[in-house]
Amino acid sequence: MKQLFDPKRNYEETRKLVGYVGRKQATQADYERIGFMSGLEVHQQLNTKLKLFCRCPAGVFQKPEEFDAELIRHMRPTLSELGEYDGTALMEFKTRKEIVYRISNNSACTYDVDDTPPFPLNREALNIAIAISVLSKLKIVGEVHITRKQYLDGSIPTGFQRTAIIGVEGEIQLKNKKVRLIQLSLEEDSCREVSDIGHVRIYRTDRLG
């Protein structure tokens, strides 16, 4: 008789094979042996009056049942500049999700639903990003270029997130050591998810932009 797969047993055997060491049992020598390094990506919403790429007010949040219209979208992947499809984008596309956006007239506009081009970058947000970069000893870039990061989970109606690098190669001084900072970026926020049931995913656009 064929033996049934035992997930717990498989997990324990895999831990032994890779030489897993529990966090509480790990020593400095263990980290040095595997050459362990880790980094953190920290996100912080800025307290600005307006959103990053349009003139809608920031920080105006609606309840799930408070919306003026619904918009339905189906996301499809596109080729990158290298002529390739992003693996994550293809995975999301295969879920065949129907994306529903709940829109409030008080917090969203045609830019947020990808019907008009972006407005000029919010100067208040840019100034805050530059100030943080200076305080963190980051080198300010000579030119700010808006780039795109592809997202097909529906959290951004365009299918990509507009983002810009503001500073690079900085550091924060702690009590006993310095923490190296690779870069600081300024990017638009995504929608807030209301639900994800079956093949329908619902978002609110109040935070978007």
Question: Model-predicted segments: where are they?
Answer:
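Basic, nucleic-acid-interacting segments
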Residues: M1-G209
